[in-house]
């Protein structure tokens, strides 16, 4: 099996053609396209950009809210000189499930809207001519998929998504599509693990290939080779190694080659950063030194393109995070585009990488009812659908770790977001996931999950599995909001005192906290939704954080305003952003800039 999640790179032995651009597109509400031959000829199609969500490109609501099957179509040319190579199609992501056809022949199926997949089409393509590529996608939700939800049928027969999560169910081909020509024998995967020494660093590596020929591994600093080894497993010894650090990223070039005699059979290049990350004595240690996490929960979300990868937006986001003094973000609530991790590697940002396990609580009304315990949420992990959900969860977790394990920016894995975790089935569901994450990751990064408001120190059955505790807390917003901030602060302290008793030396971070603020809304004295109230809430919350030595990080919710399903609790989306959806600062951004640019990186370091 030649499955590989390596990022596509052109080398002396590999060829790439990007297939992004304007494709053809058509809805298939009756799911008749396969039988009707749409894989060869897509009828009544319109133009559609790739990558992008299709939703916000339309001006009619039925198209924007469409739920069901939909098709994409394009064509690609295969050069004659590619004959004798393996021809592979690679999709960065299709939300949420996809069937891929080439020249009318089905070549791949995939479920999961946030991770890549590929299809080998060597025996199907026609050389030196154009080939038809068709993708049948579907964006319906269910309780066996990640993220979780349901799909309802309206009175007029149309389907509509009913998510258990609080972000819009954007759909489409969201990330780049590549056509690749790869050698028959090739590098499929590699992994690294780092040790710091008195004279530099050692890099233990493992390389996976699909053939018998020998492997060499070299490390370059610019044009200078600084280490080399041979074999599919080995160690690179780097003298006077330059370490990767927060806002001081240093990257080396890794070159992996397969040799047959004097010929190079395959060559794969990547960039890596030498660093260690661990938890010791209740602190996060980067290269042995304490680091206090400050930053954001985010979303891949922007005007018009929805969740589609947009590199100018990515660049702007990193510039804003540098301006405000952040050093970390969580990929809430799904793995992001690979290009975002590459930029984090280059800019020196830390990432808590989250699998799309969100919506694991059922509510008869909406996410808020479930979060407050008012929904029909008990026993989410005791359903008939749970075994299938767990199987899909393990598959997504495996792909996320396989894809992202070599990024120096990735420091931890988040295995679930706000699951209902007070019922009897919690431990049986959690245990194999945490064991799988530890087994798959050669660097043994810390594992966590985010704890929702109704899961308390004495009721949460999942927290014992976490290497550090991640709390989502909204004292002063969803709980005791408004004029009673003093009561909110007292209740917050009461819960924190409870967590102090169960941490057993583990650090605790906040992965969500915040209030909605409609940009430009001011009120004196303050009221909820105003900029003044948002700042008062943040000052109170930060005072609570600073009171507890075991609090080792603060990731505010959210980096920017983002789109959600419409409803009476959302004013055209979630407005908890510190920046607007257009990436302009709200008043609270200046509060964070003042705090985060003055906090030392080792804030709350333990005195020896």
Which residues are covered by each model-predicted region?
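Secreted/periplasmic carbohydrate-active enzymes, especially glycoside hydrolases
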Residues: 1-343, 347-351, 396, 411-412, ...
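Substrate-binding/catalytic cleft of secreted carbohydrate-active enzymes
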Residues: 204-206, 318-320, 328-595, 604-605
